[in-house]
C-alpha cells in the first residue's frame, strides 16, 4: 500500500509527457526498493537518446541511465525514500516529476506518454496506482507517516495485523499468516533476519520511532528467499539526510484510564484471579537526531529511548501478587556512506536488551524476586553497487543477539512443588514458582550476496547466495540444588501408573522430575537461487525461479547431529495486464517453501539434556478440610527466611524414565536421527485479481491454497530391532514415513529400516492395547482462503481500507508450535510421542479463524486536526476438547481427543487398560465466540515556523472494553488421570485486553 499523493507539476522543454505510478512488490528481505518505467510514443525517434535522472530528496544523491530502444528504464536497489525524476534529451529537460515514493521491497512504476514533437511547457499529473502488472507476489506496504495517522498499537505485530490473511490472539503471542503457526514467520530489519534462532515466536524489539517503512508479505515469495512457511514482516529504519533534524516524543498509557480487567472465578464461584486489581503504567520517550556528517556523502541517524513499564498482577483470591518493573533503554543508529553515486555503504547498530525484575508476594508478604533478561546487541552492514546500468550487486553481513535469561532469588535453595490434587486450593506450594533457571544466548550471523542482471529487454536475472550460522548456548535447569521439580497428584487404587497398578499405600503420588539442558549447539543454513523475470509479451510476465537449500546442525559435543540437503524449491508466477493499460491484472503463483528447524530441537536432543522422571507414593500425605497439606513434607529454612518443602517419598512406582545422562553428555547423538530425514515443506498456490476503479480507489481479490507436510519430530518408538542393538526409545525422524538407521547388528554396521506409518509401537509390546502394530499418520496442515480488499488511498483529506477474509485451516498438525499444550519448541512437540496423538488429532486447527473483517481509515477535519479509526471483527477459534488416555495405547499421560466413558477409575483384578472404553472427541467441534475491537484516535498539529512542529494525539484502544474469551480450559479430566473430571473445564483462561488510552506528543524541528 502506498502513502504518497503526487500533485500536478509544470515542466518545460521538448517532449510533453504524462506520468503514472504503480507500487510494485519485490523481494521481502531487501532494505530497498526501486523505480522502473517506460516512455511510450508513436515515434521511435522521440524515445531514442532520452536519459532519466533520479535524485534522492533527502540526501541529494543521484543516478542517471539511458532508456533502451523500447523506452524502458529501471533503477534497482534504491534506498527507501522520496525521489525527483527528470527526463532529458539533447541536454534539455523534457519531463519531471517530484516526490516519487520508494517503499521497501517495492518498485514504483513510471509511465511517460509522449504527446507531441514541439518543445513546450505542459502539465503533468502523477497518480499513485497500487497495481503492478508484472508482480505475482502478495504484499502490503505501509510507512511511518501513514501509521502515525492511525490508532495502531506501537508494535510490529499490530502492523502485520492490518494485512489480510493475518490473525492474532494465538496462545504463543505471535501471528498466524495463512494458517501457519506462530513459529513459521520471519521479521527482517534492513535485510537481516532478527527472528529468534531457537524459539522463532519472538524477534528483536525496536521502537516504532526507529522505523521508516514496513512491508508485510503474506505469500508468493520469489526464489530469492525461503526458510518460512508463514509470512514475513520486512522493515527498514530511518536514515539521515542533508538537513539536520531533531525529534522528541513521549507516549504514556496510564493505568488510571485503563478499563478494568475481568476477575476470574472457578466453577464453584470462587475468585481465582483478581484481574480488576491489576495495574499497568507504561511510559516511553525518545530523542533522535539526523543529518549530514559530510554533505551529499555521509549521513547519520541516532535514537535513544528510555522506558518505564510497571505492572501489578493479583491472583488467587488476592492471596498472591506480582509487581514487575522494566526501566531499561533502547539505543540505535545508522550511518549511510555514499562512496560515489554508484556505491553505497550502510551500517546499523542497536541494542534492545531489556531487564525486568518481578517481586512476588504471598498473603501480603514478600516471597521472591524473578529476574528476566531478553534481547541484545545487533549489527548490520549493507553494500550496494551499481556496477553498470544493467548489473547491480548487493552484499549484507549481520549479527543478531537474543538473550533469554531467567532466574530467581530463591532458585538455588527452593525446589518447585506443584499441587495438582483435586482438593488443592493453590498451585505452587513451595517457595518458588519459577519454571526453570535459564541462561540462553542465541546468535545469528548472516551473510548474503545478490545480483540483478538485465540480460535483455525481456529477461531480468536474479541470482545469489545466502548463509546463516545460528548458535545456541544453553544452560537451563529446574530450580533447587538438585534441579528437581515435584508434582503432587491424587492416587486412586487400581489405576495404572508408569506400568504398575496403584495400591492403597497413599492417597497421593509424586512425580519427581530432574531436568538439565546445557551445551553449545550450531546450525548452518545455506542456499543458492536463480530467477528469471521474463517479459513474454507487452501484457504477460512470467517469473520462473528455483532455490536450493540445506541445513546442518551440530550437537553439544561438536559432532554432526542432523543434516538435510537438496531442498529444491521451484517457483512460478504469471501476471497478465488485462487491458494493457496497467490498471487491471490477473496473477497466479505456485511454489514450494521449506522450513528448516530452528535450533530448538538440537539444543534439547543434541547431547546436552538430562531428563529423569520417577514416580513415588507420598509418605504420610494428609490434607486438611481446605485442601492444604498438613503433613507429607520436610520443611527447611532458606537463607532468605523462606520455607522450602521437599515431599517425603515413599515406595517407587515403576522404573525411572530417563533421557540423557551426565556421564555421556555431549556424545554423538546422530545415531538416533533418520539417515534419510526430510525437511518440512509447504506447497502454495495463489490466484488473484486487482484493478483500479479510478485514480484513488482500488479493489482486489485473492484465493490461496496451502499444504504443509513432512514434519520433523522426536518420536517415541517401541520396536524390537531383532539382532541389532537398540538405538533407544526416543528417535528423530518424519512421523508416518520410513526411517533408516545405522545399527550394530551382530558386530557389523547395517542400515535398518522401519516404516513408522505402519509400526511405531509393536503389536506385542505392552504399550499396544490392540495387540497389533500401531503406526502414525503423516502430519499435515491444509489451508484455503479468499481475500477481498477495497483500498482508497490518502489524498490529504481522507483514506479508507477494508478487507474480508474467509479461511479454513485443518489437518492434524499445527506446525512449529502446539497450542494445545503451550509447547513452542519446534521439532520437540508431542505429535511424535504417541501415534494416537496424530490418529485422533484431525480436524480444525488452532489457527482456523473462519471469518475476519478489517477496516481502518483517517479523515482530516482541518489541515491540523485529524480523526482516525481501526476496527477488527473475527470469528472464534476452535476449542479442542480432550481427555487423558486413548483406545490404542496404554499411555495415560497425554491429553488426546478421547475421553474415557467406562471402566475409567481403578482397575479390578483381571482388568487392564484395554478394558477402558473411550469416546472420540473430534478436534475443533466447539468454537469460541466472535471478538470485536474498535480503536479510535485523534491528533492535532501545530507549526512553530517553517521547520518546527508539534503533534498531540489521543488514541483509545478497545473503546467498548470488550473482553471476549480467547482461550478456555479444554481438558475434561485432570492431568495424569483417566477418570477424574476437571473442575475447571470450560473456564476462560485468556481474554481480550481491556480498554487503554494512549497520550502522546511529538516535536520535530
Stretches with model-predicted labels:
Residues 556, 562-566, 575-774, 913-915, ...:
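Solvent-exposed loop/turn elements at secondary-structure boundaries
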Residues 537, 541, 692, 696, ...:
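Gram-negative outer-membrane beta-barrel transporters
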Residues 318-322, 434, 458, 462-583, ...:
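Signature of Gram-negative outer-membrane beta-barrel scaffolds
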Residues 68, 91-111, 121-239, 270-273, ...:
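Periplasmic N-terminal accessory/gating domains of Gram-negative outer-membrane beta-barrel systems
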Residues 26-125:
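Periplasm-facing N-terminal accessory domains of Gram-negative outer-membrane beta-barrel systems
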Residues 696, 710, 808-810, 815, ...:
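C-terminal beta-signal and adjacent terminal beta-strands/loops
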Residues 276-355, 371-395, 399, 570:
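Transmembrane beta-barrel wall of Gram-negative outer-membrane proteins
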Amino acid at each position: 500500500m502506498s502513502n504518497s499523493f503526487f500533485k500536478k507539476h509544470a515542466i518545460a522543454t521538448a517532449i510533453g509527457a504524462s506520468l503514472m505510478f504503480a507500487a510494485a512488490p519485490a523481494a521481502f528481505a531487501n532494505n530497498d526498493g526501486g523505480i522502473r518505467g517506460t516512455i511510450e510514443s508513436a515515434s521511435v525517434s522521440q524515445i531514442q537518446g532520452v536519459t532519466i535522472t533520479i535524485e534522492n530528496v533527502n540526501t541529494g544523491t543521484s543516478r542517471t541511465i539511458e532508456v533502451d530502444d523500447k523506452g524502458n528504464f529501471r533503477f534497482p536497489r534504491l534506498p527507501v525514500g522520496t525521489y525527483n525524476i527528470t527526463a532529458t534529451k539533447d541536454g534539455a529537460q523534457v519531463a519531471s516529476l517530484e516526490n516519487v515514493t520508494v517503499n521497501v521491497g517495492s518498485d514504483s512504476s513510471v509511465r511517460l506518454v509522449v504527446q507531441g514533437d514541439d518543445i513546450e511547457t505542459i502539465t503533468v499529473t502523477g497518480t499513485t496506482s497500487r497495481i503492478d502488472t508484472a508482480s505475482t507476489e502478495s504484499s502490503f506496504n505501509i510507512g511511518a507517516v501513514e501509521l502515525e495517522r492511525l490508532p495502531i498499537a506501537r508494535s510490529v505485530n499490530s502492523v502485520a495485523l492490518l494485512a489480510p490473511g493475518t490473525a492474532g490472539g494465538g496462545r504463543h503471542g505471535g501471528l498466524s499468516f495463512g494458517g501457519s503457526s506462530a513459529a513459521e514467520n520471519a521479521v527482517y530489519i534492513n535485510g537481516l533476519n532478527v527472528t529468534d534462532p531457537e524459539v522463532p515466536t519472538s524477534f528483536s524489539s525496536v521502537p516504532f520511532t526507529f522505523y521508516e517503512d514496513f512491508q508485510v508479505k503474506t505469500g508468493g515469495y520469489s526464489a530469492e528467499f525461503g526458510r518460512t512457511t508463514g509470512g514475513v514482516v520486512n522493515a527498514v529504519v530511518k536514515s539521515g539526510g542533508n538537513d539536520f533534524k531533531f525529534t522528541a516524543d513521549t507516549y504514556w498509557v496510564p493505568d488510571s484510564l485503563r478499563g478494568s480487567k475481568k476477575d476470574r472465578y472457578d466453577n464453584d464461584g470462587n475468585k481465582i484471579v483478581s484481574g480488576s486489581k491489576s495495574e499497568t503504567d507504561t511510559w516511553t520517550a525518545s530523542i533522535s537526531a539526523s543529518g549530514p556528517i559530510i554533505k551529499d556523502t555521509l549521513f547519520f541517524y541516532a535514537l535513544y529511548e528510555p522506558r518505564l513499564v510497571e505492572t501489578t498482577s493479583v491472583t488467587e483470591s488476592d492471596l498472591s501478587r506480582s509487581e514487575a518493573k522494566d526501566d531499561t533503554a533502547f539505543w540505535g543508529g545508522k550511518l549511510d556512506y555514499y562512496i560515489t553515486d554508484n556505491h553505497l555503504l550502510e551500517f546499523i547498530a542497536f541494542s534492545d536488551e531489556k531487564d525486568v525484575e518481578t517481586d512476588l508476594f504471598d498473603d501480603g508478604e514478600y516471597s521472591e524476586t524473578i529476574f528476566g533478561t531478553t534481547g541484545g546487541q545487533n549489527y548490520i552492514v549493507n553494500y550496494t553497487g551499481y556496477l553498470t546500468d544493467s548489473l547491480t550487486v548487493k552484499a549484507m553481513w549481520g549479527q543478531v543477539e537474543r538473550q533469554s535469561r531467567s532466574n530467581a532469588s530463591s532458585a538455588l535453595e527452593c525446589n518447585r512443588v506443584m499441587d495438582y490434587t483435586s482438593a488443592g486450593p493453590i498451585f505452587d506450594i513451595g517457595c518458588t514458582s519459577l519454571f526453570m533457571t535459564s541462561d540462553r544466548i542465541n546468535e545469528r550471523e548472516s551473510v548474503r550476496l545478490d545480483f540483478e542482471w538485465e540480460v535483455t529487454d525481456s529477461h531480468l536475472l536474479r541470482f545469489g547466495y545466502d548463509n546463516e550460522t545460528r548458535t545456541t548456548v544453553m544452560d537451563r535447569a529446574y530450580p533447587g540444588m538438585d534441579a528437581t521439580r515435584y508434582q503432587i497428584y491424587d492416587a486412586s487404587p487400581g489405576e495404572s501408573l508408569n506400568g504398575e497398578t496403584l495400591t492403597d499405600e497413599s492417597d497421593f503420588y509424586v512425580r519427581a522430575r530432574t531436568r538439565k539442558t546445557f551445551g553449545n549447539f550450531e546450525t548452518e543454513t545455506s542456499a543458492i537461487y536463480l530467477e528469471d523475470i521474463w517479459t513474454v509479451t507487452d501484457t504477460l510476465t512470467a517469473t520462473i525461479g528455483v532455490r536450493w537449500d540445506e541445513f546442518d546442525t551440530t550437537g553439544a559435543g561438536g559432532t554432526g547431529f542432523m543434516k538435510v540437503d537438496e531442498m529444491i524449491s521451484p517457483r512460478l508466477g504469471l501476471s497478465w495486464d488485462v487491458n494493457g493499460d496497467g490498471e487491471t491484472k490477473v496473477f497466479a503463483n505456485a511454489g514450494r517453501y521449506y522450513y528448516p528447524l530452528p535450533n530448538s530441537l538440537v539444543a534439547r536432543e543434541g547431547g546436552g539434556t538430562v531428563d529423569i522422571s520417577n514416580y513415588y507414593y507420598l509418605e504420610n500425605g494428609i490434607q486438611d478440610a481446605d485442601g492444604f497439606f498438613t503433613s507429607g513434607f520436610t520443611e527447611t529454612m532458606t537463607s532468605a527466611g523462606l520455607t522450602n518443602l521437599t515431599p517425603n517419598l515413599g515406595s517407587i512406582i515403576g522404573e525411572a524414565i530417563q533421557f540423557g545422562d551426565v556421564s555421556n553428555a555431549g556424545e554423538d547423538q546422530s545415531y538416533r536421527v533418520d539417515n534419510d530425514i526430510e525437511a518440512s515443506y509447504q506447497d502454495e498456490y495463489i490466484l488473484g485479481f486487482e484493478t483500479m476503479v479510478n485514480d484513488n480507489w482500488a479493489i482486489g481479490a485473492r484465493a490461496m491454497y496451502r499444504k504443509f507436510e513432512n514434519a520433523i519430530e522426536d518420536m517415541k518408538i517401541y520396536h524390537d530391532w531383532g539382532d541389532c542393538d537398540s538405538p533407544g526409545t526416543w528417535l528423530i525422524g518424519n512421523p508416518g514415513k520410513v526411517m533408516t538407521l545405522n545399527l550394530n547388528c551382530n558386530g557389523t554396521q547395517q542400515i535398518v529400516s522401519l516404516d513408522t506409518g505402519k509400526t511405531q509401537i509393536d503389536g506385542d509390546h505392552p504399550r499396544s492395547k490392540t495387540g497389533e502394530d500401531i503406526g502414525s499418520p503423516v502430519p499435515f496442515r491444509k489451508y484455503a482462503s479468499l481475500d477481498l480488499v477495497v483500498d482508497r488511498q490518502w489524498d490529504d483529506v481522507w483514506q479508507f481500507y477494508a478487507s474480508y477474509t474467509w479461511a479454513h485451516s485443518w489437518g492434524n498438525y499445527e506446525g512449529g508450535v502446539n497450542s494445545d499444550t503451550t509447547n513452542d519448541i519446534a521439532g520437540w512437540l508431542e505429535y511424535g510421542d504417541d501415534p494416537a496423538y496424530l490418529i485422533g488429532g484431525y480436524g480444525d486447527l488452532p489457527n482456523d479463524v473462519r471469518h475476519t473483517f478489517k477496516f481502518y481509515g483517517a479523515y482530516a477535519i482541518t489541515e491540523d486536526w485529524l480523526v482516525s479509526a481501526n476496527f477488527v471483527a473475527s470469528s472464534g477459534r476452535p476449542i479442542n476438547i480432550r481427555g487423558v488416555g486413548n483406545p490404542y495405547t496404554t499411555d495415560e499421560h497425554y491429553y488426546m481427543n478421547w475421553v474415557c466413558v467406562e471402566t475409567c477409575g481403578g482397575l479390578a483384578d483381571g482388568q487392564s487398560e484395554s478394558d477402558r472404553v473411550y469416546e472420540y472427541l473430534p478436534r475443533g467441534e466447539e468454537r469460541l465466540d466472535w471478538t470485536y475491537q474498535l480503536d479510535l484516535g485523534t491528533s492535532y498539529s501545530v507549526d512553530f515556523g517553517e521547520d518546527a512542529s508539534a503533534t498531540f494525539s489521543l488514541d483509545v484502544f478497545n473503546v467498548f472494553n470488550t473482553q471476549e474469551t480467547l482461550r478456555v480450559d479444554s481438558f475434561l479430566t485432570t492431568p495424569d488421570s483417566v477418570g477424574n473430571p476437571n473442575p475447571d473445564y470450560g473456564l476462560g483462561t485468556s481474554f481480550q485486553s481491556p480498554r487503554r488510552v494512549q497520550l502522546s506528543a511529538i516535536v520535530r524541528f
